[in-house]
Amino acid sequence: MRIASFFTVLLTLLTLNIAPASAERIRDLVNIQGVRGNALIGYGLVVGLDGSGDQTMQTPFTTQSLTNMLSQLGITVPAGTNMQLKNVAAVMVTAELPPFGRAGQNIDVVVSSLGNAKSLRGGTLLMTPLKGVDNQVYALAQGNVLVGGAGASAGGSSVQVNQLAGGRISNGAVIERELPSTFGASNTIMLQLKNDDFSMAQKVSDAINRSGYGGTATPLDSRTIQVLAPHGNSSQVRFLADVQNIEVNVGIQDAKVVINSRTGSVVMNRDVTLDSCAIAQGNLSVTINQQANVSQPNTPFGGGQTVVTPQTEISVQQAGGALQRVNSSANLNNVVRALNSLGATPMELMSILQAMQSAGCLRAKLEII
């Protein structure tokens, strides 16, 4: 009985000490080299705007584009005609040609104002050819522009929510030309890790070789795994369908903190840890106030001149911050709680995290985008 109880306790302890390893499919970890989208771009016109289009006197290319388009439709605009248009806007149209895109397939397009149009809401994009980097037309775009923002103005005041100078057309372009593909022509396929990691490259290679494809996968560097595959399109499709569903134990990921310097957003993964440190955060504010004073001569008919003299006041205020202790934190919840205790704004938190990394208190890679 004692021996049975001992083994029961030992088995329980071993179960508690073994942390479950997280597994992810290979399709979530890698991209297939050569299977990617291609950028398309075009220039076009959006019409039907409710007086919110380009100011043609300031954007002459809009008038020129409209004249050329009307000429192609058989309508001649007399030379020297000054067209005061308010319902037309010049736009740039972008899209992505998906991998293995076929003629007749629809893709989404993004429409962005090129001139000084106030809003593209309610506009219609006229037929616009979309070209690739080789200057060949691969798709044609046309349709009603969907704008996510909203705005109104009256009496010199205006209110705007989100962006009005850009929109999207769902399935707004039709593929007219297909890209040549070499898929299936070679018996080797290159898998590229989304994040370079030597250990992950080895794990992916070992997982493929253990799943009935022994000797087919070889890691070449920290990002690329070479896989031997059967020849032919249909054979490689079946092969990749099996390989992409193989699970890999990813283990512990690199601790990383990502900071967006434009918006002040701070994002960190679950592996970020902190060491104990003391932080003092102070704010320095400079206020400049300038007023224009009018100086007039004392005698009305003395021949003097009225002058404007600026008066400037500058004040500097510094809000001192006391040292605050930040305890060491071993998990993400404690890290968030410790950073929130500082009471810092996101922009201040960016500077604090940089200083903590320099002091060796932030155990993570700091990436600023």
Swiss-Prot record:
It is found in: Periplasm; Bacterial flagellum basal body. One of its GO terms (molecular function) is structural molecule activity. It holds the Pfam family FlgI. GO terms for biological process: bacterial-type flagellum-dependent cell motility. InterPro entries: Flag_FlgI. One of its GO terms (cellular component) is outer membrane-bounded periplasmic space. Belongs to the FlgI family. Its main location: periplasm. Keywords: Bacterial flagellum, Periplasm, Signal. Residues 1-23 form the signal peptide. NCBIfam families: PRK05303.1. It comes from the Bacteria. The keyword NADP does not apply. The basal body constitutes a major portion of the flagellar organelle and consists of four rings (L,P,S, and M) mounted on a central rod. Assembles around the rod to form the L-ring and probably protects the motor/basal body from shearing forces during rotation. This is Flagellar P-ring protein.
